[in-house]
Amino acid sequence: MPFRRFRLALPAVLLAAAGTLTVVGAPAAQAAGESVNVWLTTTSDSGGRTVTRGLQQQTPVSFAATSPGAAQTINVNENTTYQQFEGGGASFTDTAAWLMNSSGALSASTRTSVMQKLFDPVNGIGLSFIRNPLGSSDLARNNYSFDDTCCDLNGFSINHDLADVLPLTKQAKALNPALKIMASPWSAPAWMKDNNSLNQGWLQSQYYGLYGEYFAKYIQAYQAQGVPIDYVSVQNEPTCCAGYPSMQWNTAGIQYFIKSALWPAFRNAGITTKTLVNDWNWDAYNTWAAPLLADTAIRNDPLFGGIAWHGYGGDVATQTTVHNQYPQVNAYMTEHSGGTWIGNQQTEDMNNLIDYTRNWDRSWVKWSLAVDQNHGPHNGGCDTCTGLITVHNGDGRSGQVDYTIEYYTMGHLTKFVRPGAYRIDSTANSAVKNVAWKNPDGSKALIAYNTTGSTQTVKVNWGGQSFTYSLPTKTSATFTWAGTPSGGGSGPGGKAITGLGGKCVDVAAASSANGTQVQLYTCNGSSAQSWTVGADGTIRALGKCLDVAAASSANGTKVQIYDCNGSAAQSWTANSDGTLRALGKCLDATGPSSADGTPLQIWDCTGGSNQKWTVQA
């Protein structure tokens, strides 16, 4: 069909009511007898560590118009959506990277196989989020920073990471291009601190500026190696702990450092890496994060990425409390280690996976990806932490790798839930805990765990159909099915808007939730790509308006859908050069890239092809 350039004058709501938002319209009819794939993991011991069945595919079952009754019922409703999934994984600590690479424990072929099993989405479990220490941590062979020489950054170098951490991170990114990479510091260089030690101590105020540049140099050095850093936190676990690399802060200091040192350094270097605050437990929120979220200069800055949580203390429901107060603040679970102190590791992991994501987390990240048979090497701190794999080094099984229960529990998420998926509604059930997701391609994944001591029959209802399954005790399950995505063709008066590579402007996962990312995606005629241009200057889909997040005109600000409110952030003007403009900036495909899932943002108008848009006549 012919296309024409269009002209419009278009405005964005800033904050929404908390809670669940429902996509308008009923789902399309589903295919009868939809096949459901089933994957199970079972342990046999009281500690939940002896894997007798690890992510084993079972005989598929099928949806039917009716199915037998069951003791437990789970209703899956893909028309109610929550947060977007960004990834799951662990950390390339110095310990993990050295064991897997230069320790000599693994042959090259074994290392290649291990990396594929960890990061390959098809031949492995598709880990999609890693959080690496920015310098030394407790799971390292020794203390180090990237510049150990006072009193400037002329000696800055990432040579330490070039040996093991960076090559493996680069390989992981090649195996899974959707991989998100986060960096967290345990300590500033010792010479910047009042005690001249990596362990504890305070950052001296005269070095705030240099420490901000230290972050920037790290990000630039990794970028130069082809490894972009998506997120940083200011400090891992503020004020914790003695005996290994760590650093003291107070909230006012962190607040000042972010606004006066870190972000100016990022802007001077042209860095768009997002900053996550807290990176600590739920019970630390009031002390470390609440004042930062209350600061609109931080919360509304394009360099702010959200809040990072650890799961070692407090109540996970704190995350929902915070979400309800700040619905536009993204939440990430960035560390919860496995360990020998945990009574049942499988139960712990499945509770974490389900509870964290039901409380708005966009990630689930364990601690060290690997440790050896002695839970090390370690640099003080945790000598009982476990990983997704155990690398035997120097013992009778040297060179062998054990895939722990944590590998399989993580795989129940990352192998089947792709970055860009949205959590969808499913019935909470204490006997069979569960969480459900809808992938960008419309497929579904229901993750469940039988918490009881006996087999449970479970009836799953979806789209007017159901299936019944007997789930054994001590068993994790992921059920997947293709499904027919909700919605249909373009609504009355709706038009497709196309951009770079002929891809369509698309609402991710067809979700009408406030804050849903707008992206490029292969044109498919769905309601998520059906846009109505209003005489009032708005562009609408799924009953919401195309919106610039927080009405910020900063380069890199997210473009989303939001309740229509008549503000300037939803007022778009189309120009004869093919650009769409709001707040003085152009609608822009990041990258520039035409890959499915490429997020849209606003940026200075450059005349580039990633800022040209057409609407179907």
What residue spans do the PLM features occupy?
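Short beta-strand/loop motifs in extracellular/secreted proteins, especially
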Residues: 420, 432, 444, 454-458, ...
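N-terminal catalytic cores of secreted or lumenal carbohydrate-active enzymes
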Residues: 49-229, 250
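Aromatic-rich beta-strand patches that line glycan-recognition/binding surfaces
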Residues: 516-522, 557-563, 598-604
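Extracellular glycan-recognition/adhesion modules and their associated mucin-like linkers
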Residues: 488-512, 527-554, 568-594, 612-617
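Secretory targeting and sorting signals
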Residues: 1-31
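N-terminal low-complexity, Pro/Thr-rich disordered segments
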Residues: 11, 24-32, 482-492, 617
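Residue-level detector of short, conserved catalytic/binding motifs and their immediate flanks
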Residues: 72, 86-88, 125-132, 179, ...
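Substrate-binding and catalytic surfaces of secreted/luminal carbohydrate-active proteins
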Residues: 32-76, 181-183, 213-221, 225-231, ...
